[in-house]
A protein has these predicted regions:
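M14 metallocarboxypeptidase catalytic domain recognition
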Residues: 1-311
Length: 311
């Protein structure tokens, strides 16, 4: 089993792929999978693990990170959650109950091309690496404005300008990364049922619930979603005193149409869906220092255990 020294620093993309293999080598009830392929041909590689009932027998939990390339802490967080779930199975009663109740599908990198670009060219690159449309020199689509749901319903929630950081692309799911993710979420929903969906981002310390596309529309389960996230926030704060704000995405952060958690909830039919903005609140922003990786992961693990106990 790999040890926690992995979380002392950030790593190149290939090392992350190797780390997923190391985790599956250490745990029999696991496998790697590919949800889709990026524009430049890189796999969206994930890890799937399960408990005593066997593969694919329980409802699915789907978590993913690095939709936005510069948000390096999100991949480390997803990998830490995978590590703790695998390390605790058969040893920790609560963790064992989680894996015996659900199949977990964790994808650290939705946007591998963008992530590689942040390591080679521009640390603060956000979008994927889509080539510029006609009459433009600006690369990239914001993948969290490209999900095929409420794609262009709110002009404040995305942009049709390819030079904008929130450029939504030429059409819903025009980007292979999003077509792959949407198809994978739907596949899980149809084959197993989708219990919980989380899209991990940074920064801001926010636990966001549907919806992003409208500040006036709320899901029927709005109160339940807010209650779950409030309990999660308390779990997070119990470790290092880090405070997270809870609320519907649009009114708490800003409008986002074509967003992941709205799609997961409305289209895939996830029972619970959230977009979580990790540390910090702006001191370091997207460039969270390596010494904060482990404290961030520790507190998120505590909150996640609360969440999984309540869904």
């Amino acid at each position: 089993m790999p040890d926690l020294s992995w979380f002392d620093s950030y790593h190149p993309f290939q090392d992350h792929l190797d780390y997923l293999d190391d985790l599956t080598d250490a745990f029999n009830n696991s496998e790697t999978f590919v949800s889709g392929t990026s524009l430049e041909g890189r796999d969206q590689k994930g890890i799937h693990f399960w408990g005593k009932h066997g593969k694919g027998k329980n409802k699915a939990i789907l978590w993913h990170g690095t939709t936005h390339a510069r948000e390096w802490i999100s991949a480390m967080t997803v990998e830490y959650l995978a590590y703790q779930l695998i390390a605790g199975y058969g040893k920790d009663k609560l963790v064992t109950s989680f894996l015996d109740s659900y199949d977990f599908y964790l994808i650290p990198f939705v946007n591998p091309d963008g992530f590689v670009y942040t390591q080679t060219n521009d640390r603060l690159w956000r979008k994927n690496r889509q080539t510029p449309p006609a009459n433009s020199t600006c690369y990239g689509v914001d993948l969290n404005r490209n999900w095929p749901h409420e794609w262009d319903t709110n002009p404040q929630g995305s942009s049709n300008d390819s030079c904008s950081q929130t450029y939504r692309g030429v059409s819903p799911a025009s980007e292979p990364e999003m077509a792959g993710m949407a198809g994978f979420a739907d596949k899980l929903a149809k084959s197993q049922g989708l219990k919980l969906f989380i899209d991990w981002h940074s920064y801001g310390q926010l636990l966001l619930t549907p919806y992003g596309f409208s500040c006036d529309t709320f899901p029927e389960s709005n109160a339940e979603h807010l209650g779950l996230m409030a309990a999660t926030a308390a779990g997070i704060a119990s470790v290092h005193g880090t405070n997270y704000t809870v609320g519907p995405g649009c009114e708490t952060l800003y409008p986002t149409n074509g967003a992941s958690y709205d799609y997961a909830y409305d289209v895939s039919g996830a029972e619970w869906a959230s977009l979580i903005e990790l540390r910090d609140e702006g001191e370091f922003g997207f460039v969270l220092p390596p010494e904060q990786i482990l404290p961030n992961c520790e507190e998120i693990w505590a909150g996640t255990k609360v969440m999984l106990s309540l869904v």
